[in-house]
Amino acid sequence: MYEHNFNNVIKKLDMAGHTLQMDGNVTGIKMAQRALKECRPGGKALIFQRKIPIILNLFASETRIEVAMKGPVSKFNPDKELHDLQFMSPDKYKDINLSDLPILPHHEGDVSGSINTGCVISMADGIHNCGMYRIQPLSDSEAIIHCYPESGLACQLEKGEDIPVTVAVGTSFQLILTAVSKLPADADELKIADSITAKGLKYIKTDRYPVPYGTQIIIHGVVSATEKRTEGPFLIHTGEYSKPEDYPLLKIESVKMIENGYYHALVTGTDYCESRTLLEAAEKFTSGLRAE
């Protein structure tokens, strides 16, 4: 059994008493309120049962991160020599629509729900780039991608060309960690995620770019270099709402979901929460890089 499979990580956490099964027949705002209350020492990851289960607080504690990483983040540094990606045959996926996903608003002032754990993979000069950007759905065929100035994706868009992307939602923590970390512009994040995985991270081939084996949702699309739409507002980590601003249009080409998959989302807040835990883990990780 491949232990870094997203579902297997959840099973390990469940067996260790780190998860709670919840009634999913509530609003996203109620889910978020419960998730924020659970962000405390001894708090659990919450799995809200519905047609597509929603999992919150998955990586909202160092203990759960260590289960996913098989050790503390601080001990993992990329190898000086990165290796070619290793591939496995994929599990079964089915085609779905973006609107089939339970993308729910978490706060009263949110303009809508958003995909906020998506690892957005692109390629430049033969190198895989990966960043985590908020994605606001507009329809089954269009969304807005919050690629903030100076982000890897924004820098690629400066060339004036549309950018094909693959978005991995519900994926390996190693890729999530590299996606939220500040790494050199020429870093191949897929290879770095592999290098910090015990026995290596396994990938699957898709219609575009590779994603980790066991990724729950795979979205293919194209980020427009010319078309923008107004994104937001959303509650951000400062406790304030983002100002509505124009960001690039993401044209959706396909959405696939693994059989019996989960929808992984995180809740943003001013107190201790999953987004803060991820940023702290990224800081420890990049501190290790600087120390090499």
Language model: regions and residue ranges:
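Non-catalytic, beta-rich accessory domains that mediate macromolecular interactions or localization
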Residues: 1-292
